[in-house]
Structure formats: C-alpha cells, structure tokens
Swiss-Prot record:
Highest taxon above the source species: Bacteria
Pfam families: ATP-synt_ab, ATP-synt_ab_C, ATP-synt_ab_N
UniProt GO MF annotations: ADP binding; ATP binding; proton-transporting ATP synthase activity, rotational mechanism
Subunit (UniProt): F-type ATPases have 2 components, CF(1) - the catalytic core - and CF(0) - the membrane proton channel. CF(1) has five subunits: alpha(3), beta(3), gamma(1), delta(1), epsilon(1). CF(0) has three main subunits: a(1), b(2) and c(9-12). The alpha and beta chains form an alternating ring which encloses part of the gamma chain. CF(1) is attached to CF(0) by a central stalk formed by the gamma and epsilon chains, while a peripheral stalk is formed by the delta and b chains.
The keyword Transmembrane is annotated on this UniProt entry: no
Name this protein carries in UniProt: ATP synthase subunit alpha
Top-rank EC class of the record's enzyme: translocase
One GO CC term on file: proton-transporting ATP synthase complex
Family: Belongs to the ATPase alpha/beta chains family.
Length: 505
C-alpha cells in the first residue's frame, strides 16, 4: 500500500477550506460568596450598573442584577432561587441592561418584574423592549397638567382632582380602601382610551388574584397590564417592579397616548430596597433605609409626565400608594413621597369605621394641580364644596357640646351632613363625570336640604335615573360642552324641582 503525501495534504486542505469556526467571546467571572439573595462576583470587570448577569446551574439559568460595582468585586442581587448557585460557580455577562417587553402584546397579561408571563397564557410575543431604568423627561419636554383624569369617585374628582400627567399619592393605614380607590379608577377608564398598569409589590398572591378577578369581571383587563412581584419573590424583583411597570407606561406616553400607573405600594418597595441595600453593605441612614431612598422614589415618580405638543402630548399619570403605621404621616417614607408628588388623598380609619367610604379626610387631602385638572362644569359645582365640608367638620366639633346654635350654623351643619352622605359611594361603582356634576349640583345648590340624611343616596340614585328618562339632554350637554351655561343651569334646576315633588310624594 502506497501512501501519497500530496493526496493526504489535498484532503486536509479541502477539509480546512470548508471548516467555519464561530468564536464566541463572553466575559465570565466566578462567585466569591452567595447567600440571602446576594452574590459577590469576581472577574466581570467591564460589567455595567443594572446589567443582567447569568448564573448557569444544573437547574437552568438564574439571572442577577448588578447593583454594586466595587474595586475587586461586583455585588449582584439574584432574581430567583439562589440555592443552586455555589461558591466558585461560573457567571456570564449578558451585556444587556434590565429591560421588559412593552406594547399592546402585554395588554391583559400578568407578568413579573423582568417581563416573564405568570398567568399561564403562553409566551409574550412582544416586538419592542424598553429599559427598566430611563431618565425622566426634562423641563422643556413637559407641559403643565391641563386635562382631567377622572377616577369616577365624586369625593376625589370634586375636591382633589387628578389630571393627566399628575402624581397623586394615596396614603393611609392598612385595610381602609387604598387599593379600592385604585381599582375603581382603573374600572372608570373603560371608554377613556387610557391604558392602565397595576404594579403589585410585596402582596399576597391571593390578594393580587382577587384584584385581577375584579378587573376581569368589570371588563377592565382588556386595557390593563398587571406587574406582580409577590411577597414570596426575591427582594430584587420587588425593588425593580415599579420601574418595570413604568417602562410599559412610558411606551404609551411617548406614542402620544395616555396611561395610568398604580404602584401598590411603595412602602413595600422601599422595604425591599432597604433589604437589598443592607445585604450589599451599603451604609444605612434614617430608619435603616439607604441614603438614596429619596432618589429611588423621585426618579421613579418623575417619569410620570404630560409631554408637550411637539412630543405628541402623551401622558403618564401615577397613583402611588403608601401604607402608614397608626396614621403616622410624618414617618420617613410617607414624608418623602408626599414631597415628591403633586398632592395626596389621605384616608382615615375613623371615617372608614364610621361608614364614610371612600374614607377621604378632606382637610388633609390636597391636589397641587387643582382646578387645572377640572372641567369648567366641575369647577362650577365643586367650588364651594371643599370649604363647606371643612367648615362643617369644625362646626361639628362645637355642636357636640350641645350648645344652642343659631339658624345659619344649623343650616351649615345640615348641609354638611347631607354633602358627606352624598360623597359616599359603593365599591366598584365609579360614576361618569357628567353624572357626578349633576349629583354635586343637587347637593351644593341646596336641593337636598329638606331630604332626610338616610335618604340622600336613594334620592341621588332615583334623581339620576329620572334625569336619564326625562331630561337626557342635560347629561349629554354637560358631557359635550363641559360648562354649565345659564340656560343649562335653568334646566337642571327645573329637573331637580320636578323630581323633588315626585320623590316626596
């Protein structure tokens, strides 16, 4: 057998010619230590802040978020189970900053903080992704809030109105209806074209399921995205959930559309951030929160804005929720968020247990946007309401002493009692703006003064259905023209007088 060298070299040349090797370069490191959802990683020198790192384990890939970039190691918050990550395990850089899917593909879905679906409806076919952390629009990019965003709750729309692009805080103790206000507001956006994002942070899965079921029952899931970071999820996921939800809302804001985001609640997000920060050995400040906790909330809430006309005039409205302990509004996190937002709706346990629901304390609740977020019609009926109720609260305290009251004081007390009753509203029954105007008109113009207090809500319900039947043009004119002209005022007065005769008969 003869071996031909040139034949062999020819075969080798042909083999080499067809060989294509793809070189894949990835910067890797090693885990120095791991525990409590935090890993210290060595070797990923070009790692960026907020970059996703991959931890390959025998049970699949776990992702982590690079938070501390130190001289000799990187502090990583692990966004999943850390029990399979061992000391000395390999870590890979992804080169990607944390981002989430955005757009209409996410509507009606329940997702976690990193954009994975958790509703069992299959993968999300998103065409666009957006970074979780982006810089808020600058001063020139914005315009002042000038358009109402109705909550459907008479007490809020009349006295602490919310405008598109505003940040209005909902604050109060546990279990007094903070989430109920947020859910009612979402339900009320049904025909407004506003996309809603509900961010649940640190809540029980059963609570989130209940909210989702309520939204589904009222047909609100068609225009709502739910971002859930439950109580059992790692602190890192709870910390970035509001930013993830905000990125989804910004997509609509930047497209010239309108979005509403609810953070339920930022107290739990602050606690999660405190946990992560302390485990990363960042120095603690007041109440053991890290020094940048104010910045953490301000950079999130500043992303809610009303953009100017050149940028499409879109808006993102934020309703952050803060839970207080025994009504202490002067604690660290509540004071921080109050100073960042454009007003607050303060809910009070005493009112809640007295049956005033929504339990809004009129004196402590404000909207720093105010009349700019109201239509002319709403301003006309609600102008005196806040003052009347504040005076009623003062007089009520005096009336308890049982001293003889003059007629004017007695009349004011009677009006206040009826207005307080009129502002009560059952849960999941938001009211269109034109019906709110009609209802408040009846109260502020004295048409309820002779009605017994316990019959006020019955009067309101029957009066609105009477107007629907006999005078539908009143409601349609309020809706279209957004102002109560002298002619319309006369019609409204006539309708109410006619109904009062029927109601008492």
């Amino acid at each position: 057998m003869e071996i031909r060298a040139e034949e062999i070299s020819q075969i080798i040349r042909e083999q080499i010619k067809d060989y294509e090797k793809q070189v894949e370069l990835s910067e890797t490191g090693r885990v120095l230590s791991v525990g409590d959802g935090i890993a210290r990683v060595y070797g990923v020198e070009k790692c960026m802040s907020m970059e996703l790192l991959e931890f390959p384990t025998e049970h699949g890939v776990v992702y982590g978020l690079a938070l501390n970039l130190e001289e000799d190691n990187v502090g990583v918050a692990i966004m999943g189970e850390d029990i399979h990550i061992k000391e000395g395990s390999e870590v890979k850089r992804t080169g990607r900053i944390a981002s989430v899917p955005v757009g209409d593909a996410v509507l009606g879905r329940i997702i976690d903080s990193v954009g994975n679906p958790v509703d069992g409806k299959g993968p999300i076919e998103a065409k666009e992704f957006s970074r979780v952390e982006v810089i808020a629009p600058g001063v020139i990019a914005r315009q002042s809030v000038n358009e109402p965003m109705y909550t459907g709750l008479k007490a809020i729309d009349a006295m602490t109105p919310v405008g598109r692009g505003q940040r209005e805080l909902i604050i109060g103790d546990r279990q007094i209806g903070k989430t109920a206000i947020a859910v009612d507001t979402i339900i009320n956006q049904k025909d407004s074209g506003i996309i809603c994002i509900y961010v649940a942070v640190g809540q029980k899965k059963s609570t989130v399921a209940q909210v989702v079921e309520t939204l589904r029952k009222h047909g609100a899931m068609d225009y709502t995205i739910v971002v859930a970071a439950n109580a059992s999820d790692p602190a890192a996921l709870q910390y970035i959930a509001p930013y993830a939800g905000c990125a989804m809302g910004e997509y609509y804001r930047d497209k010239g559309r309108h979005a509403l985001i609810i953070y339920d609640d930022l107290s739990k997000q602050a606690a999660a951030y405190r946990q992560v920060s302390l485990l990363l050995r960042r120095p603690p400040a007041r109440e053991a929160y890290p020094g940048d906790i104010f910045y953490n909330h301000s950079r999130l809430l500043e992303r809610a804005a009303k953009l100017n006309a050149e940028l499409g005039g879109g808006s993102l409205t934020a309703l952050p929720i803060i839970e207080t302990q025994a009504g202490d509004v002067s604690a660290y996190i509540p004071t921080n968020v109050i100073s960042i937002t454009d007003g607050q709706i303060y809910l009070e346990p005493n009112l809640f247990f007295a049956g005033v629901r929504p339990a809004i304390n009129v004196g402590l609740s404000v909207s720093r946007v105010g009349g700019a977020a109201q239509t002319k019609a709403m301003k006309q009926v609600a102008g005196r309401l806040r003052l009347d109720l504040a005076q009623y609260r003062e007089l009520e305290a005096f009336a308890k002493f049982g001293s003889d009251l003059d007629k004017a004081t007695q009349a004011q007390l009677n009006r206040g009692m009826r207005m307080t009753e009129l502002l009560k509203q059952p849960q999941y029954q938001p009211m269109p703006a034109e019906r709110e105007v009609m209802s408040l008109y009846a109260g502020t113009r004295g048409h309820l003064d002779n009605i017994p207090v316990e019959k006020v809500l019955e009067f309101e319900k029957e009066m609105l259905s009477f107007v629907d039947r006999k005078y539908p043009e009143i409601l349609s004119e309020i809706k279209e023209k957004k102002i109560i002209s002298e002619e319309l005022d006369g019609k409204m007065k006539k309708a109410l007088e006619e109904f009062a005769g029927v109601f008492q008969a």
